[in-house]
Swiss-Prot record:
Other noteworthy facts: Overexpression prevents homoserine lactone-dependent synthesis of the sigma S factor (rpoS).
Transmembrane feature ranges: none
PANTHER family referenced in this protein's UniProt entry, alphabetically: D-GALACTONATE DEHYDRATASE-RELATED, STARVATION-SENSING PROTEIN RSPA
GO terms assigned for molecular function: hydro-lyase activity; magnesium ion binding; mannonate dehydratase activity
Protein name: Starvation-sensing protein RspA
């Protein structure tokens, strides 16, 4: 089944998405997501100028061979741009293969391992009271796992805080320059346990409670924080410290039993190897769009299963609905599933990407349409051209550049 066309689309129905569409000689099409927030045009160029021409004439069924060709053939292996491009190709080819087999992707992968995919939502607020109101709203929607972030007294901005009450959190700022945010570790460490205490006192322990530290702490600060919140029985603390220094997670492990989730910025199994092998984390957060697609994620998940590490895939709305659809198929199948992040999408976004998934009482299902179960409206997408936007940077209160 030869590939006859490979096209790249960059569209901004509220935020930028990079979509790959592959067409075979039989007229079967497959979609892949290559979105890399703040660096979308780099990936689009990598696909358009380098990978797409080399797809023409290839057998779409030879997914593994194509994956290896683009990974090993590049010589400059790994990295977010290369791996996001490979991920999109892989995703689109699995979409084609499942459509050719006339079955949903999760069936082609080996069938469902569960009835539905537990997803976690994001709650936020400028104050504890606002965060509690947002928590209650998501609780009423049926979510069983809820991430809680909040504005911190004495800090004008912080990660995870929406720009207005009831609005979804949107980190990227449109324009040619990123927003600069200030950070105070001591204010954070003093305040955040008070937020968790308020949540548990009001809502109890019925829902899984999650929190994202977003790489802000040093190893010893992360250890101190994890120990201080053990009574609140967190589902996980996410990205407590930059994961480039993987050895430091031994120190964190020595001081706290709060579960740890890491990996949303990882691009391959090699990035995950030490943390998984030494059981320094409990959840691996790699995502289909950045870690090699279905093929790459299967390797990571299989390796993680040997060490009882579960998946908790990154899934914010700066990954397109194509990624979300693929992730739900993967999550429904993968044996060592933990949870899936789900921020949701605007009506405008879902008009460009008509989908087939469903949400019911805290669980999602990808649907049973052949392939990924998602479409792409090219004409509508063309009405939303690319708009420059960048993720923020963080500085300490004295002006020192810090980890955002």
């Amino acid at each position: 089944m030869k590939i006859v066309k490979a096209e790249v689309f960059v569209t901004c129905p509220g935020r930028n998405f990079v979509t790959l569409k592959i067409t075979t000689e039989d007229g079967i099409t497959g979609l892949g997501d290559a979105t890399l927030n703040g660096r979308e045009l780099s990936v689009a160029s990598y696909l358009q100028d380098h990978l797409c021409p080399q797809l023409i004439g290839r057998d779409a069924h030879r997914i593994e061979d194509i994956w290896q060709f683009f990974y090993k053939g590049a010589y400059w292996r790994r990295g977010p741009v290369t791996m996001s491009a490979i991920s999109a190709v892989d995703m689109a080819l699995w979409d084609i293969k499942a459509k050719a087999a006339n079955m949903p992707l999760y069936q082609l992968l080996g069938g469902a391992s569960r009835e539905g995919v537990m997803v976690y939502c994001h709650t936020t607020g400028h104050s504890i009271d606002e965060a509690l109101d947002d928590y209650a709203r998501h609780q009423e929607l049926g979510f069983k796992a809820i991430r809680v972030q909040c504005g911190i007294p004495g800090m004008k901005t912080t990660y995870g805080m929406s720009k207005g009450k009831g609005l979804a959190y949107e980190p990227a700022t449109k324009g040619q320059w990123p927003e600069e945010q200030l950070w105070s570790t001591e204010k954070y460490l003093d305040f955040m346990p008070k937020l968790f205490d308020a949540v548990r006192n009001k809502f109890g322990f019925n829902e899984h409670l999650l929190h994202d530290m977003h790489h802000r702490l040093t190893p010893i600060e992360a250890a101190r924080f994890g120990k201080s919140i053990e009574d609140y029985r967190m589902f996980w603390m996410e990205d407590p410290t930059p994961a480039e220094n993987q050895e430091c997670f031994r120190l964190i492990r020595q001081h706290t039993v709060t579960p740890i989730a890491v990996g949303e910025v990882f691009n391959s199994i090699w990035d995950c190897k030490q943390l998984i092998e030494e059981q320094l984390i409990d959840y691996i957060r790699t995502t289909l769009t950045h870690a090699g697609g279905i093929t790459g994620m299967r390797r990571i998940a299989d390796f993680a299963s040997l060490y009882q590490v579960r998946t908790g895939s990154h899934g914010p709305s700066d990954l397109s609905p194509v990624c979300m659809a693929a992730a739900l198929h993967f999550d429904l199948w993968v044996p060592n599933f933990g949870v899936q992040e789900y921020m949701g999408y605007s009506e405008q976004m879902l008009e460009v990407f008509p989908h087939n998934w469903t949400f019911d009482n805290g669980y999602m299902h990808p649907g049973d349409k052949p392939g990924l179960g998602i479409e792409f409206d090219e004409k509508l997408a063309a009405k939303y051209p690319y708009e420059p936007a960048y993720l923020p940077v963080a500085r300490l209160e004295d002006g020192t550049l810090w980890n955002w």
